[in-house]
């Protein structure tokens, strides 16, 4: 995918099936090029049949977001879907219920950056004398962070030109 979101190696190799499924899904979200099944197999230290079983689960998971794992002969696999779907999936797979940012391979300072964005949002809201629930500020900061990361690499959301903004 992108140089910075070219994920650093994860801290540890996943052991269980669900951990591998999440790892593979996150890996595919991070890449904007093909990766071979053999490369994944070597990264995860699993057999071909184990990887095939995990990939079935990965496909099911990503389909929930409107994303598809596509295969190209002699190239490997990669994700296909709209930029909006990719961003939504990233937000849900990298942001945990406990409020912690899961390190995406290559993001490095995600949690720190999101906290900085939150502080900016809070200070602007305070200046305008507006208050928002903490969860809303956190979600907005996360979406801004993802958008900034994706835009740096020319991954922009396309809008339908037929949509009109109503002015009241």
What is the predicted role of each segment?
Residues 1-168:
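A cross-family "folded-core" feature that marks the main globular domain of proteins
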């Amino acid at each position: 995918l992108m140089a910075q979101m070219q994920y650093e190696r994860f801290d540890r190799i996943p052991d269980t099936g669900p951990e591998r499924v999440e790892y593979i899904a996150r890996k595919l979200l991070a890449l904007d090029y093909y990766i071979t099944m053999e490369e994944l197999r070597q990264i995860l230290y699993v057999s071909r049949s184990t990887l095939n079983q995990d990939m079935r689960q990965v496909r099911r998971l990503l389909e929930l977001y409107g994303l598809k794992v596509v295969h190209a002969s002699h190239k490997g696999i990669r994700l296909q879907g709209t930029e909006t779907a990719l961003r939504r999936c990233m937000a849900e797979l990298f942001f945990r219920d406990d409020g912690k940012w899961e390190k995406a391979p290559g993001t490095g300072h995600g949690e720190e950056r999101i906290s900085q964005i939150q502080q900016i949002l809070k200070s602007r809201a305070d200046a305008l004398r507006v208050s928002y629930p903490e969860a809303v500020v956190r979600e907005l900061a996360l979406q801004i962070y993802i958008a900034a990361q994706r835009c740096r690499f020319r991954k922009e959301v396309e809008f339908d030109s037929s949509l009109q903004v109503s002015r009241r």
